[in-house]
């Protein structure tokens, strides 16, 4: 099984093309975990860096026409060097423009995984789910949404919420770990996309296990952070979450995981 130990040994370079709000939090989270982040946003630089990368994150949170072109260029280069790319289609259900960009990236470029909340992933497959911007209300059929997207796109899917669902090759698992404090801190979902990009390329052909490990490490770190002094407060939780990502071990994952 893909492990946190393996990630720390390989220390993959992860290119993060992400939104302006979360760059610092994302970089610090990846460093704490054991990966090596780079926030490059220029095609010539990406050509150089992606030769050595273990993963690429495309997060469309800060969307512009120029950024759309950047996403396209990055995905072309990633495919050239066989770098697994993860798409976070932020708020793609909020309007036609975001949906158009997400559809373009999914249908015309090679992706290793798509990560989004229930509202975002449901919008990609035409399922109605109550959502508002980047947020999504509690959803009971999250596993069905994940499976529908996996079947439609033939791409591994991660749907996040109170319960998380992972669908790969028609198989679905649900993750029941996590902290209620995570939605209280901006950027936790965006960092998750980068964490997935860190794990997804560690072992070829083991996408389900890689995604499961990424989700468990992330969610159990959230549980650890919330239990610490003042972890119920957003400011403290944010700091303690980074600390927990630094300290969490494979033994913690094995002991506390709740997977169905």
UniProtKB/Swiss-Prot annotation:
Catalytic activity entry? 5-(2-hydroxyethyl)-4-methylthiazole + ATP = 4-methyl-5-(2-phosphooxyethyl)-thiazole + ADP + H(+)
Q: Does the keyword Repeat apply?
A: no
Residues annotated as binding substrate are 39, 187
* The protein's enzyme class: transferase
- Please list the cofactors this protein needs: Mg(2+)
Which Pfam families would you find in this protein's record? HK
Source domain of life? Bacteria
Q: Which GO terms describe its biological process?
A: thiamine biosynthetic process; thiamine diphosphate biosynthetic process
Q: Alphabetically list the UniProt keywords.
A: ATP-binding, Kinase, Magnesium, Metal-binding, Nucleotide-binding, Thiamine biosynthesis, Transferase
Q: Which InterPro entries match?
A: Hyethyz_kinase, Ribokinase-like
**Protein's UniProt keywords contain Glycoprotein:** no
Q: Name one GO molecular function term.
A: magnesium ion binding
Q: Pathway, per Swiss-Prot/TrEMBL? A: Cofactor biosynthesis; thiamine diphosphate biosynthesis; 4-methyl-5-(2-phosphoethyl)-thiazole from 5-(2-hydroxyethyl)-4-methylthiazole: step 1/1
Q: Which SUPFAM superfamilies match?
A: Ribokinase-like
Instruction: State where ATP binds.
Output: 115, 160
The EC number of this protein is 2.7.1.50
The text of the family note is: Belongs to the Thz kinase family.
In terms of NCBIfam families, this protein maps to: PRK09355.1 (NF006830), thiM (TIGR00694)
List the HAMAP family: Thz_kinase (MF_00228)
Role description: Catalyzes the phosphorylation of the hydroxyl group of 4-methyl-5-beta-hydroxyethylthiazole (THZ).
Q: By what name is this protein known?
A: Hydroxyethylthiazole kinase 1
Q: Which organism is it from?
A: Streptococcus pneumoniae (strain 70585)
């Amino acid at each position: 099984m893909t492990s946190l130990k393996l990630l720390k040994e390989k220390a993959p370079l992860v290119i993060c093309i992400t939104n302006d709000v979360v760059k610092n939090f994302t970089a610090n989270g990846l460093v704490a975990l054991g990966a090596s982040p780079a926030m490059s946003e220029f095609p010539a630089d990406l050509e150089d860096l992606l030769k050595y990368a273990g993963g690429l994150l495309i997060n469309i949170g800060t969307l512009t026409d120029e950024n759309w072109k950047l996403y396209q260029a990055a995905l072309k280069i990633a495919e050239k060097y066989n770098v697994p790319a993860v798409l976070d289609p932020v708020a793609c259900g909020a309007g036609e423009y975001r949906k158009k960009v997400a559809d373009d990236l999914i249908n015309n470029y090679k992706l290793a995984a798509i990560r989004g909340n229930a509202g975002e992933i449901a919008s990609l497959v035409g399922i109605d789910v109550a959502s508002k911007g980047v947020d999504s209300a509690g959803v009971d059929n999250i596993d069905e949404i994940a499976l529908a997207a996996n079947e439609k796109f033939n791409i591994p899917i991660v749907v996040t919420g109170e319960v998380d669902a992972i669908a790969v090759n028609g198989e679905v698992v649900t993750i029941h770990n996590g902290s209620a404090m995570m939605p209280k801190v901006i950027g936790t979902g965006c960092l998750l996309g980068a964490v997935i990009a860190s794990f997804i390329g560690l072992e070829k052909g083991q996408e389900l296990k890689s995604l499961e490990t990424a989700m468990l490490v992330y969610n159990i770190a959230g549980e650890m952070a919330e239990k610490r002094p003042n972890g119920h407060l957003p400011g403290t939780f944010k700091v303690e979450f980074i600390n927990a990502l630094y300290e969490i071990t494979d033994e913690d994952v094995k002991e506390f995981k709740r997977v169905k």
